[in-house]
């Protein structure tokens, strides 16, 4: 729906856990999944997409800076964090001792509450020049002479000469099907699978106070797989999201200190790049996430110490944890029954590596939520 009619019943306090709405308002509508994110804006070409495949770094940075001016026009902050400071470089040197690589970036944190307000301001301006049609399902795309025809669920057909399709990650599988039908070759054989880590904010405070979000990459010794931290949220909250009926986990943080928690959360993701003949990474990721749902009815949570010992976390064991979960609807269980052994081994090794630069990361009561899955939109 439009930016004003998107309301998650969990956030509104009407229910305690996901009720599987037919359309997830957290993920779909004006602003997409970003509408309720905490608005991290990264100034870098080291990660965040593939634009550098088509233009040089200077051009990409010029576009990133342009988008920042648009964001500020609609209310974004001018405050930034950077890895290009003496304190950040000291963190980078310390991380390298343990084969952890800190990616270079300048970052702005808008905050969940401010991000929504900025998008509302954009929506008001765009309404003056664009006609929107919300809650209108496009069933199919067909060629129509030199243009295209869209078949809507209501039975209507819309014809156009030029068509821009941007269904986001929630519509990635649908988009792949449409491209296959149209004979358009796609590039996408990657999915990232992992967990969301939650621990006391003080454990990472010496890092988040300097760079806010640390993007750290580690190559595991056991398998040689790449594991990375992603979407770090100091004093944040862990949340569930619904991707086509599958509950996955995510996180966010507010700018307002009054809305903060005592914990920091971040994702640990293992990159999975598949080779021929396998070409269904999206379905693979959904299947992994569905195993967590099958075991817990939603998002699963486990203490790190229990995972290492091979013990299932239950309500009693979770109640003993000094780290209190911010996602109270998460169900205690055993991640080893849901995630593949290889990815789980990678995650455990990464946690021990992080513990060397942020002592306390590998504490028994560090909480792991699963599954977190990052889907990649297909590219032409």
Predicted region positions:
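Conserved catalytic/binding loops enriched for acidic/polar residues
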Residues: 55, 65-68, 73-74
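Compact, glycine/acidic-enriched structural inserts
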Residues: 76-78
């Amino acid at each position: 729906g439009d930016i004003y009619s998107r309301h998650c019943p969990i956030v509104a306090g009407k229910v305690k856990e996901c009720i599987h709405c037919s359309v997830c308002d957290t993920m779909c509508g004006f602003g997409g999944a970003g509408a309720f994110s905490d608005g991290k804006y990264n100034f870098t070409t080291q990660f965040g997409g593939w634009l550098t495949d088509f233009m040089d770094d200077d051009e990409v940075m010029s576009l990133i800076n342009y988008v920042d001016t648009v964001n500020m026009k609609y209310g974004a902050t001018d405050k930034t964090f950077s890895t290009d400071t003496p304190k950040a470089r000291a963190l980078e040197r310390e991380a390298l001792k343990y084969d952890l690589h800190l990616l270079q970036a300048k970052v702005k944190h808008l905050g969940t509450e401010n991000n929504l307000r900025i998008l509302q301001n954009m929506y008001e301006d765009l309404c003056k020049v664009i006609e929107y049609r919300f809650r209108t399902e496009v069933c199919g795309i067909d060629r129509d002479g030199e243009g295209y025809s869209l078949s809507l669920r209501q039975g209507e057909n819309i014809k156009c000469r030029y068509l821009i399709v941007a269904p986001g990650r929630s519509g990635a599988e649908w988009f792949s099907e449409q491209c296959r039908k149209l004979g358009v070759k796609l590039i996408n054989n990657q999915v990232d699978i992992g967990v969301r880590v939650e621990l006391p904010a003080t454990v990472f405070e010496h890092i988040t106070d300097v760079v806010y979000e640390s993007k750290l990459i580690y190559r595991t010794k056991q398998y040689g797989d790449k594991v990375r931290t992603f979407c770090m949220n100091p004093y944040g909250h862990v949340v569930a999201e619904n991707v086509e009926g599958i509950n996955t986990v995510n996180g966010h943080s507010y700018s307002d200190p009054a809305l903060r928690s005592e914990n920091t959360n971040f994702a640990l993701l293992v990159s999975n790049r598949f080779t021929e003949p396998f070409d269904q990474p999206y379905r693979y990721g959904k299947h992994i996430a569905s195993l967590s749902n099958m075991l817990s009815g939603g998002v699963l949570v486990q203490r790190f110490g229990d995972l290492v010992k091979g013990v299932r976390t239950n309500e009693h064991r979770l109640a003993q944890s000094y780290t209190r979960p911010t996602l109270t609807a998460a169900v205690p269980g055993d991640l080893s029954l849901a995630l593949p052994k290889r990815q789980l081994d990678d995650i455990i090794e990464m946690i021990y590596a992080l513990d060397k630069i942020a002592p306390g990361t590998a504490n028994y009561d560090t909480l792991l939520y699963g599954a977190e899955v990052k889907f990649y939109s297909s590219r032409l």
